[in-house]
């Protein structure tokens, strides 16, 4: 499981830069690190191997082609201008792997890049970023998702998150740990977000389409998934934003960072997360109104069905009588709060075993009432970017779903 312990990049967030860096507020970094340590330990205690993204990146930066690939993603920023781009490239080329990794993640300010010159450099404020930090790297599920032995590297729609995907691409291309893996999707393609890809069952993949993932990306991913023999059905699930009801519990003026149901694009995994072979945590306002189109391969292309209720389409594709729904809350107000705190973004470590933020009291109670064992972890600061345990994890290997103690 790839995770990223928050570090210096989170300390770069100020009240002024919150919106630009996709956070709702300035996080308490020390507490966020403590919460993440507890999360990682919970994964280990459950028998999951934890891989830290920072360590993987440092290892990868030992290889010249990987360095070139990562640096190129930085220098592609059109705001730099030719002169500053050349100077920055020379500066990055001279850094050791550890320092380069730190700069790629935490960013670089004008004051820290003292050898710069030229018009662009002079017009920057002392604390303006020459290289933007990547505080959203915390959510490793967004930048890549594994489908069997194949990895789909995201192509983020938001400019502030695109470098995350390029760093993951460099790791998968050059780190010995991932030698032989096949890439199904790349950051240069149509917008696709890992948080929109949900594995419902062996052979069945649901992909949300909306503000993060386009229909064109869904089509390309579906073709490649079928060609790889990983799935027989891909469900296309629209996740367009909806007006926020007065009782939704969503904070006024809120704009989604990682994805919410009301008022901004939502990741599919904040709406629906599997917690058993036949059960999913779902936002109650959408569970029975969400639709899906079933996509399957045929000789001359793709077969696309008419829209169906999501629950019916999912059950049919999964070969079960029905997909059980575990609501995130009791009523519209409670459900809205649960969604805002990513109550549905639980991490399933196996059938009937899930990791959830302890703050999601109502959702956790409902999970346990449905027979799901809940591993509670602190998340008051980790949730400041509106993500959850599932979003903070990227599984790179899974045991068969029939195994009693481990799953998808």
Language model features: what each stretch is:
Residues 1-408:
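The feature marks the mature, well-folded catalytic cores of soluble enzymes
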């Amino acid at each position: 499981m790839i995770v990223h312990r928050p570090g210096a990049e989170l300390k770069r967030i100020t009240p002024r830069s919150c919106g630009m860096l996709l956070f709702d507020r300035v996080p308490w970094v020390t507490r966020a690190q403590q919460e993440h340590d507890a999360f990682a330990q919970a994964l280990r205690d459950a028998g999951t191997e934890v891989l830290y993204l920072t360590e993987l990146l440092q290892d990868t930066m030992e290889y010249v082609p990987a360095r070139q690939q990562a640096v190129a993603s930085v220098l592609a920023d059109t705001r730099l201008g030719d002169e500053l781009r050349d100077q920055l490239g020379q500066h990055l080329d001279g850094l050791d792997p550890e320092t380069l990794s730190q700069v790629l993640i935490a960013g670089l300010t004008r004051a820290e890049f003292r050898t710069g010159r030229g018009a662009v450099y002079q017009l920057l404020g002392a604390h303006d970023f020459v290289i933007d930090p990547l505080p959203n790297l915390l959510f490793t599920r967004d930048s890549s998702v594994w489908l069997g032995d194949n990895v789909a590297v995201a192509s983020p729609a938001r400019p502030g998150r695109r470098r995350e995907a390029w760093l993951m691409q460099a790791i998968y291309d050059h780190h010995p740990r991932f030698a032989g893996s096949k890439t199904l999707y790349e950051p240069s393609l149509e917008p696709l977000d890992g948080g929109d890809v949900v594995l419902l069952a062996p052979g069945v993949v649901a992909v949300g389409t909306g503000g993060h993932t386009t229909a064109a990306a869904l089509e390309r991913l579906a073709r490649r998934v079928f060609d790889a023999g990983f799935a027989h059905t891909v469900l296309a699930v629209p996740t367009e934003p909806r007006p926020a009801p007065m009782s939704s519990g969503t904070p006024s003026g809120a704009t989604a960072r990682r994805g919410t149901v009301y008022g901004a694009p939502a990741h599919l995994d904040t709406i629906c997360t599997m917690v058993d072979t036949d059960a999913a945590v779902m936002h109650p306002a959408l569970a029975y109104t969400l639709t899906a189109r079933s996509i399957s391969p045929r000789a001359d292309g793709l077969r696309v069905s008419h829209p169906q209720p999501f629950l019916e389409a999912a059950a049919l594709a999964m070969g079960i009588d029905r997909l059980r729904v575990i609501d995130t809350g009791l009523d519209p107000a409670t459900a809205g709060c649960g969604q805002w705190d990513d109550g549905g973004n639980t991490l399933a470590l196996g059938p009937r075993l899930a990791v959830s933020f302890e703050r999601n009291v109502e959702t956790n109670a409902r999970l346990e009432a449905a027979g799901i064992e809940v591993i509670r972890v602190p998340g008051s600061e980790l949730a400041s970017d509106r993500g959850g345990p599932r979003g903070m994890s990227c599984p790179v290997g899974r045991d068969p779903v029939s195994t009693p103690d481990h799953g998808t």
